[in-house]
């Protein structure tokens, strides 16, 4: 049985980690390198590092930040934000990333999914999907840091990215993000019914029960930010709780 993964998310602007609510009203919560090292020591299974304004501002990838963070990190590091082409991916992997996450560029150029999977392997490609609910069992895909609607139905997109060679999906509910009221569990169940890819749940974790419910549904990993950044829970607390509830997680 594969262990379920606990993944802290570091949303960055420059070298600073920030956190907002529904992708807006962000505030600085710390330094990227320091937080990454802290979470690794606490027992994080992976770290996700996202430049949250790169795509919106049309900037290239933050290679210098990745190099700095990766230099003293030994857990897998997934990096995203502003990746436009194969060369961006190559630079990030060379800088120390283990996986790359693409979102806006995947929607604007779906062939990039095929190209990355072919060049580097599906195992290093995460497709991040940000969605807003638009009705019963209906969600729309958003890009540019959750600010631009695409008109693309989530179901259609999740099926397409799997066919094109994505290795994993990072699924974020914009509606739930930062509100600490739980993941969109209906969205997670819906995604699992249409995709066989490993699924990372993101957006809304506020309690230990929230994490448990998502993992119980069948996601492979839970990503969280606020509960770790603001000291609500430590990673060891989370893992002990999940073990007690019968969820298999790695304990150091």
Swiss-Prot record:
It comes from the Bacteria. It is found in: Cytoplasm. GO terms for molecular function: imidazoleglycerol-phosphate synthase activity; lyase activity. One of its GO terms (biological process) is L-histidine biosynthetic process. Pfam families: His_biosynth. This is Imidazole glycerol phosphate synthase subunit HisF. It catalyses: 5-[(5-phospho-1-deoxy-D-ribulos-1-ylimino)methylamino]-1-(5-phospho-beta-D-ribosyl)imidazole-4-carboxamide + L-glutamine = D-erythro-1-(imidazol-4-yl)glycerol 3-phosphate + 5-amino-1-(5-phospho-beta-D-ribosyl)imidazole-4-carboxamide + L-glutamate + H(+). Pathway: Amino-acid biosynthesis; L-histidine biosynthesis; L-histidine from 5-phospho-alpha-D-ribose 1-diphosphate: step 5/9. PANTHER family: IMIDAZOLE GLYCEROL PHOSPHATE SYNTHASE HISHF (PTHR21235:SF2), IMIDAZOLE GLYCEROL PHOSPHATE SYNTHASE SUBUNIT HISF/H IGP SYNTHASE SUBUNIT HISF/H (PTHR21235). The keyword Acetylation does not apply. Heterodimer of HisH and HisF. One of its GO terms (cellular component) is cytoplasm. IGPS catalyzes the conversion of PRFAR and glutamine to IGP, AICAR and glutamate. The HisF subunit catalyzes the cyclization activity that produces IGP and AICAR from PRFAR using the ammonia provided by the HisH subunit.
């Amino acid at each position: 049985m594969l262990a379920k993964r606990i993944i802290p998310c570091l949303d960055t602007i420059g070298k600073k980690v920030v956190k907002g609510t529904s992708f807006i009203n962000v505030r600085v919560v710390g330094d990227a390198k320091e937080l990454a090292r802290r979470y690794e020591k606490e027992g994080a299974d992976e770290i996700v590092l996202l430049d949250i304004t790169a795509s919106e501002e049309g900037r290239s990838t933050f290679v210098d930040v990745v190099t700095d963070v990766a230099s003293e990190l030994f857990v897998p590091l997934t990096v995203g934000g502003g990746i436009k082409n194969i060369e961006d991916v190559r630079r990030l992997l060379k800088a120390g990333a283990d996986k790359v996450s693409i979102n806006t560029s995947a929607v604007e150029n779906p062939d990039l999914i095929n190209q990355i999977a072919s060049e580097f392997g599906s195992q290093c490609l995460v497709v991040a999907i940000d969605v807003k609910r638009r009705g019963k069992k209906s969600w729309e895909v958003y890009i540019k840091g959750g600010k631009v609607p695409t008109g693309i139905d989530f179901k259609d997109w999740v099926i397409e990215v799997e066919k094109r060679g994505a290795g994993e999906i990072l699924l974020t509910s914009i509606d739930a993000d930062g509100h600490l009221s739980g993941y969109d569990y209906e969205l997670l169940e819906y995604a699992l019914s249409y995709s066989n890819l490993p699924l990372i749940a993101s957006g809304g974790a506020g309690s230990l029960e929230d994490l448990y419910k998502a993992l119980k549904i069948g996601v492979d990993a839970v990503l969280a930010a606020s509960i770790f950044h603001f000291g609500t829970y430590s990673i060891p607390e989370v893992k002990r709780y999940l073990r007690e509830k019968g969820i298999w997680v790695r304990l150091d």
